[in-house]
């Protein structure tokens, strides 16, 4: 009896329900069972069902860069650990690929996709390419950057945002014109019928800081400096759908400020080590309660000496906050094994140390770590006209 005959005896809805509970790498294998299964898995109904299931089991996504090679891992975020102070989990390798040019640092994350604005891959050989990747499926596509008019127009950042209403991804590039002393923007809607960059202007002249971005409920947030002397700091709030800007003045700014999703609201976390980069570690948290009224809530937490873990007591960095409010920290430059992730619960004042197995396999030098909290696997990647399959531990035919 072949696979189609087996399938006939099982209700299709039941098959889809079972498949939707599997990880993405297992879904890739299931496509090879039969043409019928492949057809079912590609249906929009199934991709939506899979996304719904995946949303209930968020993961910590980890990207490791070493000399131009990128590897993507995921591991489950701990739940119900009930008094435990340490756990050991295994990292799941999703894919890896190589850059063609010098290694570049920095990326932008939005709704399960990662944008590497300065990355080139040997297949295309174009110096002006960026790469957008779906780490769950192994697919990636190219974003050809807009040509600049002259050397006096300088791009400051290249950001990825997502509009959850129209389900559109957009790339935003702020460009500062030194002659006109103004900030223009190039913006690209991915997957649009008319492909092309558009220009929009900002009501204020500003230069983005290098603290990164975060997109929450269709608003892309990043930090910048304004004024002619560029000596005032603001929070830029860009509505991805309407393409309107709001600027909020900040009374405090630090180069280590991390933008986070704090229970559905924009949060900023500053970290301050008391002694030589070690514990105790002070975390100052600002949560944006109301954009129109510019109302903020503030909290201060301290990870004390009795919280520390000897292997990772120095140079930790905040990478995000889980949906339940736990602050996640890692060492972003790694030379030692094994790899640790720390989850600080501010309500209970507890610190959970998670040792991650399998992350350092094949790594032999200093490498950089990027981590993204509450990553949800998504099978969709229809935002690019042409896509490619990155090298992974699975064969090419197993990729979407």
From Swiss-Prot:
- Start and end of every F-box domain? 4-49
Q: Which InterPro entries match?
A: F-box-assoc_dom_typ3 (IPR013187), F-box-assoc_interact_dom (IPR017451), F-box-like_dom_sf (IPR036047), F-box_dom (IPR001810)
Q: What PANTHER family does the record tag this protein with? A: BNAA05G37150D PROTEIN-RELATED, F-BOX ASSOCIATED UBIQUITINATION EFFECTOR FAMILY PROTEIN
Record protein name field: Putative F-box protein At1g30920
Q: Which organism is it from?
A: Arabidopsis thaliana
Q: What is the lineage of its organism?
A: Eukaryota, Viridiplantae, Streptophyta, Embryophyta, Tracheophyta
């Amino acid at each position: 009896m072949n696979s189609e005959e087996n399938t006939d005896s099982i209700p299709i809805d039941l098959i889809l329900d079972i498949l939707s509970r599997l990880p993405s790498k297992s879904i890739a294998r299931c496509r090879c069972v039969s043409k019928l299964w492949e057809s079912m898995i590609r249906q929009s109904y199934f991709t939506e069902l899979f996304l719904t299931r995946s949303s209930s089991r968020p993961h910590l996504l980890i990207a490791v860069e070493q000399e131009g090679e990128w590897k993507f891992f995921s591991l489950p975020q701990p739940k119900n650990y009930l008094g435990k102070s340490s756990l050991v989990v295994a990292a799941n390798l999703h894919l890896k690929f190589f850059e063609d040019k010098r290694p570049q640092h920095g990326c932008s994350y939005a709704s399960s996709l990662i944008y590497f604005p300065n990355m080139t891959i040997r297949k295309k050989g174009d110096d002006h390419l960026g790469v957008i990747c779906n780490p769950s499926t192994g697919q990636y596509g190219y974003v050809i950057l807009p040509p600049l008019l002259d050397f006096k127009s300088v791009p400051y950042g290249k950001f990825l945002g997502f509009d959850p209403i129209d389900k559109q991804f957009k790339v935003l590039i702020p460009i500062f014109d030194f002659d006109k002393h103004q900030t223009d923007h190039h913006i690209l809607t991915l997957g649009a019928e008319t492909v092309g960059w558009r220009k929009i202007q900002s009501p204020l002249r500003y230069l983005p800081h290098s603290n990164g971005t975060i997109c929450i409920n269709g608003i892309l947030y990043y930090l910048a400096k304004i004024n002619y002397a560029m000596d005032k700091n603001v929070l830029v709030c860009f509505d991805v759908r309407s393409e309107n800007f709001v600027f909020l003045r900040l009374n405090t700014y630090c180069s280590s400020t991390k933008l986070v999703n704090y229970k559905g609201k924009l949060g900023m976390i500053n970290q301050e080590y008391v002694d030589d980069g070690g514990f105790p570690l002070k975390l100052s948290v600002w949560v944006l309660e109301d954009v129109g009224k510019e109302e903020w809530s503030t909290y201060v937490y301290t990870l004390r000496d009795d919280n520390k873990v000897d292997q990772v007591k120095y140079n930790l960095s905040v990478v995000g906050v889980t949906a339940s409010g736990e602050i996640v920290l890692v060492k972003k430059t790694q030379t030692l094994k094994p790899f640790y992730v720390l989850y600080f619960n501010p309500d209970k004042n507890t610190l959970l140390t998670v040792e991650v197995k399998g992350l350092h396999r094949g790594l032999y030098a200093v490498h950089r770590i990027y981590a993204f909290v509450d990553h949800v696997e998504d099978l969709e990647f229809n935002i690019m006209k042409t896509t490619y399959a990155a090298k992974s531990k699975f064969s090419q035919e197993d990729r979407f």
